[in-house]
C-alpha cells in the first residue's frame, strides 16, 4: 500500500534485494515470534547499528561463539538504491574465542544436533563445523521438510542481513527470517518504537 500514486513499483524500489529474495519461501513462512518495545534512542541510531558490525561485540557478546562477527571477516554491500547487505560467516566462531572450545560447542551444539551432528566430534576441529553443517543440511533437507537446492552453501549457515532504506532490516535463511523495524516515536524524538518479528 502506498499513498503516492506516482511512486515506482516496489520491485523497482527494492532492486537487487528483490532478486536476492526470489528463492526464499517467504510466502510460506508464518510469524512465530514478535515483540514491540519503546526504546530510549532515536530510530536512526537503530538503523545505523544494524547497518554495520562494530556494535556486535557490545550488543551481542555471545555472537562471537557462533559467528565470525568481526567487521574484517564480514562483507558489506551498499547499493545505489540506498539499501545495503551485510554477509557474516556463521557456525564459525570468532578468532577471539578459539581457546574457549567448550563454550563454542555448548552454544553451537543445539543448532548442529538438530541436523544429527555431534558437538563432541568437533573438539579440536571448530573450523570444520561450518562446512560440515552445509553438507549435512543438503543431505537431510527433504527429511527435515526443507528444499535447499536453490541456495548457495553460505546461505545455509551465514548471516545474510539486509537494510532497506529508511527504517527496515531483516536477516534471512532458507528456514527462517527475522524482521527489525525502528520507527520514530510519535511525540519524543529521543525515543523509538522498535518492532521485531520472526518468521519460519
Locate each region found by the language model.
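C-terminal catalytic domain of Rieske-type non-heme iron oxygenases
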Residues: 1-200
